[in-house]
Design a protein with these regions (language model features):
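A short, structured loop/turn motif at beta-sheet edges
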Residues: 24-26, 57-62, 116-121
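A general structural signal for short secondary-structure junctions and capping/turn motifs
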Residues: 25, 44-45, 184-186
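Extracellular structured ligand-interaction cores
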Residues: 50, 63, 112-114, 150, ...
Length: 378
């Protein structure tokens, strides 16, 4: 407890000192303000890259990076707050060399785009950043699409400039889901997991910048006061060949083998566990849709596949002929057909198709078993 209080006190003292210090610093004409775009990595937190702001002034010996992607793992109820959308993210600063050392260690690319701003706006942005750090204005509730390290950098720059100089310039009819999907290539179960946990919001056409690499491309087209906002070529500060991860289990083959064994073995206990797992995941989706502040999780039509009613099939799977289980199976099959109609033009249709087939096969068997008009041994 004493260590925690000491750390908080030290941090507040540092931030207050930083604000006071920055207000006394007058940036020189040699000041450069740039946006750093960090390439993707193979860890879950790095799959989409990262955005940060760099302010460098040789005259005042400043070379600092402002990073809006920090959070505290020691936050009480971390997992529940993250799920609910109540987890606070915040900005921190790094010496530029330390920032680069981290990405050198992770073998991730870093690109730099210098903003063509007059000195007074450079000073204003510098002051705004430090005031936000010390006042707590840099603390924000993370939202996957609407509020993240990229959108926060865009917001503070546009606020400083007094106009939406940085906005989506590239034209595309892609949905948020379609944009995100390729980022999970070579990470099969992450791709599958995000495909089924995201709801209808991510099927909307993307109308704003929310990813680092997207920001980098749009900056090339952005203007301010009838001039290009980035007038120099994008600099590559770090460049590494992409590392393609390999895993004996995190791939589509293990997924197909697993579902194939369920169908081929046709064991009562396995079928029961499958129905229970699918239904439980569906209950989780419904719960998150109401509980979570992450709008991306709301209105999740994937619950038609992960049908909570399947839990009843688990509970009474081995029962003798029950007419209501027959109708339950038919109703679940109807929901599955509706799901296919909704999903058929979505980017994640193929990845969930094996589960659709498995569900359909097991539900047909369940319906036949509990239809008194058909005598069949299963």
């Amino acid at each position: 407890m004493k260590i925690t209080i000491f750390k908080i006190t030290l941090l507040l003292t540092f931030l207050l000192g930083l604000e006071s210090y920055s207000q006394n610093i007058i940036l020189s004409e040699r000041t450069k303000i740039s946006i750093l775009t960090c390439g993707t990595g193979n860890e879950s937190y790095s799959l989409f890259g990262h955005t940060a702001l760099r302010i460098a002034d040789e005259t005042t010996y400043i070379d600092v990076v402002y990073n809006y992607g920090a959070f505290d793992f020691n936050t009480p109820n971390f997992v529940s707050k993250f799920a609910k959308g109540d987890l606070d993210y915040f900005a921190i600063t790094h010496p530029f060399n330390d920032f680069m050392a981290d990405y050198t260690y992770e073998h991730r690319n870093v690109y730099e785009q210098e903003l063509a701003l007059p000195l007074d706006l450079k000073q204003k942005l510098f002051d705004n950043l430090n005031t936000a750090l010390s006042s707590g204005e840099s603390v924000y509730r993370y939202k996957f699409i609407d509020k993240n390290c990229t959108t926060m950098v865009i917001d503070i720059i546009n606020t400083t400039l007094g106009e939406a100089a940085i906005s989506k310039k590239t034209t595309s009819e892609l949905t948020y889901r379609s944009i995100l999907y390729p980022y999970f290539d070579n990470h099969f179960y992450e791709q599958l997991g995000t495909s089924i946990i995201f709801g209808s919001k991510v099927d909307a056409i993307s109308d704003h910048i929310f990813l680092p690499l997207d920001l980098m491309e749009n900056l090339k087209l952005s203007t301010f006061r009838n001039q290009k906002l980035v007038q120099t070529e994008t600099k590559t500060l770090l460049n590494y060949a992409p590392l393609v991860p390999s895993s004996w289990w995190n791939n589509g083959y293990s997924y197909l083998i697993f579902l194939g064994l369920i169908v081929i073995l046709n064991l009562k206990i396995i079928n029961q566990i499958y129905f229970f797992s699918m239904g439980t995941i569906g209950v989780l989706f419904v719960f998150l849709g109401f509980y979570s502040g992450h709008l991306e999780l709301a209105n999740n039509y994937n619950v038609l596949l992960f049908n909570p009613l399947l839990i009843l099939s688990f509970c009474f799977y081995g029962a003798t002929q029950r007419k209501w289980l027959y109708y339950l199976a038919l109703f679940s099959l109807l929901l599955l057909v509706i799901y296919i109609v909704i999903l058929i033009n979505k980017v994640h249709f193929l990845i969930v198709l094996p589960m659709i087939f498995t569900n359909g096969y097991l539900l047909v068997k369940l319906a036949l078993k509990h239809n008194k008009r058909i005598s069949i041994i299963i």
